Design a protein with these regions (language model features):
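N-terminal glycine-rich "phosphate-gripper" loop used for MgATP/nucleotide binding
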Residues: 87-91
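Iron-sulfur (Fe-S) cluster-binding modules
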Residues: 1-63, 74-85, 96-161
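Short gly/ser/thr-rich secondary-structure transition/capping motifs
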Residues: 67-71
Length: 161
């Protein structure tokens, strides 16, 4: 599973034009939800805040896997009114949307950190293969669905670089 972190709200709105952008927010319900930057909760949080601040949010949807072109086709998203798509997913999901919606501005609002393993019974995930620039994340654990860092290790696994 890919661990990504979402940009700050302030950084996201810097990429938007309040007058011109008609925004669709699409959220991954797998990796991004598990990491706390996708799923219905993060979609609603971002969507409501943008609307409150006067942005034109035309559509919102949750897809099972944002990185899967067959799943994307099966989703039959109706985002014709949008000219801008905010994708709450890892870079693989963002890339899938850029390929399938070349006529729209597709915003990447997350940064990939690395690969993780999950313990769904204890609702935690652990970074086991950080990407370049994120080596300090090796072995760090987080609460699933929120991305909240944990202070003690729960998953017993030796991580080596």
């Amino acid at each position: 599973m890919i661990f990504s972190k979402i940009e700050s709200y302030e950084d996201i709105v810097k990429k938007l034009d309040k007058k011109e952008d008609k925004i669709a927010i699409i959220s991954c319900n797998t990796c991004a939800r598990t990491c706390g930057n996708g799923g219905i909760n993060k979609l609603n949080e971002l969507g409501f805040r943008l609307i409150r601040e006067g942005y034109n949010v035309t559509d919102e949807a949750v897809v099972l896997y944002a990185c899967s072109e067959p799943i994307l086709r099966e989703s039959k998203l109706n985002i014709d009114d949008a000219n801008t798509i905010i994708v709450l997913s890892c870079s693989a999901g963002w890339s899938c949307f850029t390929r399938n919606y070349p006529d729209k501005k597709v915003l990447k609002v997350t940064e990939d950190i690395g690969l993780v393993i999950t313990d769904t019974d204890r609702e935690i995930f652990k970074v086991v293969m950080p990407y370049k620039g994120h080596e300090s994340e090796l072995g760090n654990e987080y609460r699933t669905n929120s991305g909240e860092p944990l202070t003690s290790n729960k998953i017993k696994l030796r991580c080596v670089a």
